[in-house]
UniProtKB/Swiss-Prot annotation:
SMART domains on file: S_TKc (SM00220)
Domain Protein kinase: residue ranges: 21-309
Family the entry assigns: Belongs to the protein kinase superfamily. Ser/Thr protein kinase family. MAP kinase subfamily.
Gene: mpkB
GO cellular component entries: nucleus
Function noted in UniProt: Mitogen-activated protein kinase (MAPK) that plays a role in conidiation and regulation of secondary metabolite biosynthesis. Acts as a repressor of dihydroxynaphthalene (DHN)-melanin production.
Keyword 4Fe-4S applies: no
Disruption outcome: Leads to a strong increase of dihydroxynaphthalene (DHN)-melanin production. Results in about 3-fold less glucosamine and a lower level of alpha-linked mannose within the cell wall. Does not affect virulence.
Protein source organism: Aspergillus fumigatus (strain CBS 144.89 / FGSC A1163 / CEA10) (Neosartorya fumigata)
Protein name: Mitogen-activated protein kinase mpkB
Chief localization: nucleus
Pfam families the record matches: Pkinase
Amino acid sequence: MVQQPPQGGSRKISFNVSEQYEIQDVIGEGAYGVVCSAIHKPSGQKVAIKKITPFDHSMFCLRTLREMKLLRYFNHENIISILDIQRPRNYESFNEVYLIQELMETDMHRVIRTQDLSDDHCQYFIYQTLRALKAMHSANVLHRDLKPSNLLLNANCDLKVCDFGLARSAASTDDNSGFMTEYVATRWYRAPEIMLTFKEYTKAIDVWSVGCILAEMLSGKPLFPGKDYHHQLTLILDVLGTPTMEDYYGIKSRRAREYIRSLPFKKKIPFKALFPKSNELALDLLEKLLAFNPAKRITVEEALRHPYLEPYHDPDDEPTAPPIPEGFFDFDKNKDALSKEQLKTLIYEEIMR
């Protein structure tokens, strides 16, 4: 049944979903999708329905496929789940994907913009983010696009990580050469190694993003709001200071090393000077999350055990997930060889399985 949410403006949005759902309001729009709130009439449950029209671009198809496969794979309190996927009538008429998900009231980006967060809030939100990340990393999955708008929240302060469209396997044997072409993740939360070398990306890139999010929660504004690639690195080094010799030689790319060497020497700014009102333990964790050298950055498990998160840490209630099976990301390895039609078939098969 085709339904149209009430909307201002001239653009019409129609949702072709089962009569079990009553569409209510548009709650979000992205490059290739619209999210509406709805009611599942048989149960009275409020849900979010994400309508995706990915078939114009291979990249959107790949993101949709990753999102569906991974959200179905994880079953975790702090990762958004797919309650249902609308099954198309047939392949011929299949040109939209409808994901039915839990309805969350807001996201971290909106919350940070509209209110000051207490230290308790910061603790609880970072704890839940790391709890989700522990499951992802134990499954050998990198999220790669952690940022405040991808942390969904409800009135209970429950947090769920969403948007797995850029995720990939940490055990990936390819050289990540396609990584940057598709890597449109928000620059502000990108780890320095992503800009300084094109070879190895590890779980530490997600840990860096968590550090950027914690800093933003503490101050209410982004820590490294770079305008472009060079500006981004400059902002990072303005705070962290010029890398030590050991960290400098840890950078794989010679070109990247030469670029760093060409920059003026900078002294580190203590986080206490940037966040004078913040809890000392929060700043100690921040220091460890935002280590310039990925090899020295704290792991998710270590971060969960950090004294700042002690009020919430419970080793018996921080579940891991099984490693993703061999072949789970095969479509990604062959992505350049797959036509849009082949990708559409893969998405159709994933929905119908």
